[in-house]
Amino acid sequence: MSNTTRTPVLTAPDAIQRLQAGVHAKAQNFYAMYSSVLGGIVTEPALMVIPLDDHMVHRGHAVFDTATLTHGMLYQLDPHLDRLLRSAESARIPLPFERGELREIVFDTAAASRQSDASVRYWLSAGPGGFGLGPGECVGSSF
């Protein structure tokens, strides 16, 4: 086998540059994302990514909900969070944070979006850790 390849092997800076160059026009309404993998909020759509080994990606082991941001206020967030937490319990997804911290993250992410009217979507996943069938290989759940 030859040591040369026509398929590029990218460095981290090259990969980030390509992610930035590859942002599609529909991403114009991707305002902010909290990533428990990164441990913070990003506002650049190119960085709004999920690890391939996250069980949400290859097993569908996740739950989600959507709240409405209207006039800068999150409408009925507490009932939405309650539903998310019930769904997570049913799906046997442990919480990566206490409820209060999840609530704060949703508020902070909505604020970072700099929008006054938008849909706020959030997911709880079994998390990354491998490509097997069971969640036991996950290193921790993701929000």
Where are these regions (language model features)?
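Conserved alpha/beta cores of soluble small-molecule-handling proteins
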Residues: M1-F143
